Regions:
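Hydrophobic transmembrane alpha-helices and their immediate junctions
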Residues: 86-126
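A membrane-periplasm/extracellular boundary helix in multi-pass inner-membrane enzymes
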Residues: 1-22, 40-45
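Short, flexible micro-motifs
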Residues: 54-56, 94-97, 140
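Long extracytoplasmic/lumenal interhelical loops at the membrane interface
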Residues: 21-90
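Transmembrane alpha-helices of multi-pass inner-membrane enzymes
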Residues: 101, 118-130, 134-165
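A short hydrophobic/aromatic micro-motif that marks alpha-helical segments and, especially, helix-coil
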Residues: 60, 66-68, 104-108, 146-147, ...
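Hydrophobic alpha-helical segments of polytopic membrane proteins
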Residues: 1-3, 107-110, 147, 165
Length: 165
């Protein structure tokens, strides 16, 4: 299985088809299909500002014309992208608040420490969450946000390794 994994091929597998971004990689294409369905449907249904809320599974995951979105056990309700999930649940305003919160954390760090080294911890966590359900679960968000709190609270005591001298 590991011999078949070709990351470079997947990265260059994206193309436009009938106005939609698609991929020759089945997993990437499956996720792109869900994400685009969520965003397009929100614009079509006028939910850009309010989102779907938190009381139900996204309609796109229940779409009978796209079997398999709920997974083999029928329990998969996540869209596998934290930004799309935030946008779909609470609309553009909630997505703005998410970005403003993280920008505030970064600016606080910058003002206290005069560098952007906190990005070494924030960016990888967010990138992973763009492609999987890490921040849509229970454990990872607790670890992530408690770590950020601890790191920011003790920023003057924490010695961050200087990477560039």
């Amino acid at each position: 299985l590991a011999d078949e994994k070709d990351t470079v091929r997947v990265i260059f597998s994206f193309y436009m088809h009938y106005g939609r971004l698609e991929s020759t990689d089945p997993t990437a294409n499956w996720r792109l299909d869900i994400w685009q369905d969520v965003v397009f449907d929100m614009f079509e249904d006028g939910l850009v500002f309010s989102g779907y809320g938190y009381n139900e599974i996204f309609p796109q995951m229940l779409d009978p014309t796209a079997p398999g979105r709920l997974g083999r056990d029928g329990m998969n309700e996540h869209v596998h992208n934290y930004f799309v999930n935030i946008f779909a649940r609470g609309g553009i305003f909630q997505l703005f608040l998410f970005f403003a919160f993280h920008l505030g954390l970064i600016m606080y760090w910058k003002n206290e420490n005069h560098n952007y080294q906190i990005l070494m911890y924030i960016i990888p966590s967010i990138v992973v969450s763009l492609l999987d359900i890490t921040l849509e679960g229970v454990q990872f968000p607790l670890i992530y946000y408690f770590f950020l709190y601890y790191f920011l609270k003790n920023s003057t005591k924490v010695k961050v390794i200087e990477l560039y001298g």
